[in-house]
Design a protein with these regions (language model features):
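Mid-to-C-terminal Rossmann-like scaffold of FAD/NAD(P)H-dependent oxidoreductases
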Residues: 258-356
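Glycine-rich Rossmann-fold phosphate-binding loop(s) that bind the pyrophosphate
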Residues: 1-2, 24, 112, 133-138
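Flexible, glycine-rich terminal cap/loop adjacent to redox cofactors
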Residues: 12-16, 24, 38, 217, ...
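Beta1-alpha1 glycine-rich phosphate/pyrophosphate-binding loop at the start
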Residues: 1-59, 145-166, 359
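Rossmann-like NAD(P)H-binding beta-loop-alpha module
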Residues: 119-167
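FAD-site-proximal beta/loop scaffold in flavoenzymes
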Residues: 104-128, 199-201, 207-284
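A Rossmann-like FAD-binding core segment of flavoenzymes
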Residues: 16-20, 60-78, 83, 149-241
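Glycine/serine-rich phosphate-binding loop and adjoining beta1-alpha1 elements at the start
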Residues: 62, 71-72, 79-119
Length: 388
């Protein structure tokens, strides 16, 4: 996504030089969100971008692995030989974390690529007993698709709640009920001890029948190939980009899931593994490569998830010390949570309340102060909750 958007943004902003897009996968560039939804359920054959790369003068080199980069020489090393560059954009994304001990075990799947989705489609069509490891965003979306297909689904989560790494306990706790409502079993405080063909064994001694096991325990930046390049990496092995998405190497930029950037708005470095970041960042990269007017990247992060019949949206970035305000009852189909810092909205999670989400992005961008009492009233439009 981020690589495609970078190439297109360069052309849209008037870049006339050569643009080459290199990808390890053999498929035409495609969008990832539909993989856990329409593609997985067979409602769509693929999710290729409707982009005429030839008309835009973008050369595609697909199915080509890049093995390294030598910034001093301005060259990439690939399986087909070196490729020179004047400017380089790193947009390698993230790769799923594998379940230890599961490599080579029949029936164990990841869900990150088009090939992954294609391998999982017959699993759903045959209505296997499915065990999902991890109750994060991807785990919940796959469990939703599996239940829609008529599969028996058990979700195993090591933490005490779903989305433990993304949301505080009081916000994530109501979401646990969504699993049972959809006919899926959620097992928390449960760790996988081992996986065998047809079964998952937990650390409490229980055995779960599993015609298929889908692992969704997180992702890490795909940057191992940068070893020895001298390009600075962060604590999560992500590329450290600056406010203009430049790396520590001259003429090398980084964007999307593989890179973190300093946010002036939030006062910390952000690593955002979501679709919107891969769409917005490339525009900044393109502007800085062209160089007519330097651009700073400081977005209001945004993502969405469709799970168990609910549309979940999140904007911004919250911290543990932010004030949490509820808008609505979390046992109902539609509710919102707001986070305030010094009276200003920093983040919002909306379940079935897209208007709250739309209004929140503008309020976050402008650092508008809100009245906590008005903010807590779901009958009052968020934009009307401004402090007097």
């Amino acid at each position: 996504m981020a690589g495609v958007q970078s190439a297109v943004a360069l052309r849209e902003q008037g870049f006339t030089g050569t643009v080459t897009l290199i990808g390890a996968e053999p498929h035409q560039p495609y969008d990832r969100p539909p993989l856990s939804k329409a593609v997985l359920l067979g409602k769509a054959e693929g999710s290729a971008f409707d982009i005429d790369f030839e008309a835009l003068g973008i050369e595609l080199r697909l199915g080509l692995d890049v093995t390294g980069v030598r910034p001093a020489d301005h060259e990439l090393d690939t399986e087909a030989g070196p490729v020179g560059y004047e400017s380089l954009v790193l947009a390698t994304g993230a790769e799923p974390i594998r379940l230890p001990g599961s490599d080579g075990v029949p029936g164990v799947h990841l869900l990150r690529t088009l090939d992954d989705a294609e391998r999982l489609r017959p699993v759903l069509a045959e209505r296997h007993d499915v065990v999902v490891v991890g109750a994060g965003w991807i785990g919940a979306e796959f469990a939703t698709a599996a239940r829609d297909a008529g599969c028996s689904v058990t979700v195993v989560e090591a933490a005490d709640r779903p989305l433990a790494g993304a949301l505080p306990a009081e916000v994530a706790a109501p979401m646990a009920a969504w699993y049972a409502d959809a006919g899926a079993e959620l097992r928390t405080h449960a760790r996988v001890e081992r996986v065998e063909p047809g079964a998952v064994f937990l650390d409490d001694g229980s055995r779960l029948p599993a015609g298929a096991v889908v692992v969704g325990i997180g992702a890490r930046p795909a940057t191992a190939w940068l070893a020895g390049s001298g390009i600075a990496l962060g604590a999560h092995r992500e590329v450290l980009a600056d406010e203009r998405l430049r790396t520590s190497a001259s003429d090398v930029y980084a964007v999307g899931d593989c890179a973190s950037f300093p946010s002036g708005r939030y006062g910390e470095r952000l690593l955002v593994h979501h679709w919107d970041n891969a769409v917005q960042g490339p525009r900044t990269v393109a502007a800085n490569i062209i160089g007519e007017s330097p651009a700073v990247y400081d977005p209001v992060p945004y993502f969405w998830s469709e799970q168990f019949g609910r549309f979940v949206q999140y904007a911004g970035h919250h911290a543990p010390g932010d004030e949490l305000i509820w808008r609505g009852d979390p046992t109902t189909p539609a509710w919102t949570v707001c986070w305030l810092r010094d009276g200003a909205l920093t983040a919002l999670l909306a379940v079935g309340r897209p208007r709250d989400l739309a209004q929140s992005r503008k309020l976050i961008e402008s650092a508008t102060l809100l009245d906590p009492t008005l903010t807590a009233d779901p009958a009052i439009p968020l934009k009307r909750a401004v402090a007097g």
